[in-house]
Amino acid sequence: MRRPPSAFWTLLLYLAAFSTLSYAAAAGIVLQGDAGPGKGKHIVLVSGDEEYRSEQALPQLAKILATRQGFKCTVLFAINRKDGTIDPDQRDNIPGLEALDSADLMIIFTRFRDLPDEQMKHVVDYVESGRPIGAMRTATHAFDLKTSQTYQQYSWNSKVWDGGFGRQVLGETWIDHHGHHGKQSTRGIIAKGQENHPILRGIQNGEIWGPADVYEVRLPLPGDSQPLILGQVLDGMRPTDPPAAGKQNDPMMPVAWVKSYTGKQGHTARIFTTTMGAAQDLQNEGLRRLIVNACFWALGMEDKIPARTNVDLVGEYQPLPFKFGGFSKGIKPSDLLMR
């Protein structure tokens, strides 16, 4: 008679199975995904901001994309050069960006990064390849390249390439806070005429909400930009708070839009940008659905967007409030696989 497996061997078998789905890469984490419409596609998510906890938001987003939709996801982080921990204050180091060489979609959520040429080259090559981009919150001011001049035009305040990567590729650079930061939150209102856009499938008007405030943008947005969601400034930090009176909501600022970008080599890419996306914002199901739907759209897979995309949270998700210096210290990418 066979003896039942011990708890040790049961655990070992479980870990072996789990390791085929997710593992720690040299500088990030890789989630292989499972069956689903995204199977066979590779999304690289690049984090690195000091305030809005992209290091928490993007791993959760990757888990949703991999577990619920079948995408392979690689998540990269700002890494402390001395101890290998995730450190958003390390502005000059996001190792592993060579993963972009095989990516089908880049999702970027960085702020004022000053990356060395050998890392930045992978970003620039990706942007010029015509492959799609999804951008969140501070990605409008993703780079502040001071150490090297090679790719300085990508800086948020570039005069050579007006507004840099943010303005030229995504549609806007950093302008200002439009809502009162930390005191006024954001409700998402569907832009007139966009009700049937595939990215908005399954999203109700006013359903999207987040505690991070509305960013100011210049109107109209450039080129072929199409606003999808307008940010209604709320007088308070709860989704039930009333709209702010006065000029803040007249007009409302776009907080999510789509556009195209054609690079120097003539390749044209689909671009989705949202100035929402703080880690706490992703607790809102409507915003998660917006971003996941946008991934399908960016990849030219809008026919795969169902009536109500499954964007249920995966595992534990307790995001920290947005603030400078508020990240969890001592965490390595491999630690995130156990959460």
Language model: regions and residue ranges:
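N-terminal secretory signal peptides that target proteins for export/translocation
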Residues: M1-F8
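Catalytic beta-strand/loop cores that center a nucleophilic Ser/Cys/Thr
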Residues: G28, A66, K72, R91, ...
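A glycine-rich, often tryptophan-bearing local segment used as a flexible ligand/cofactor-contacting loop or short
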Residues: I108, R113-G202
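Helical hinge/lid and interdomain linker segments adjacent to catalytic or ligand-binding clefts
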Residues: G28-A35, V44-F143
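Extracellular ligand-binding/catalytic regions of CAZymes and related secreted enzymes
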Residues: A26-G38, Q56-A57, T67-R68, D235-R339
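Nucleotide donor/acceptor-binding cores
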Residues: K41
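Bacterial N-terminal signal peptides
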Residues: W9-Y23
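Active-site-proximal beta-strand elements of phosphoester/diester hydrolases
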Residues: S47, L228-L230, F272-M276
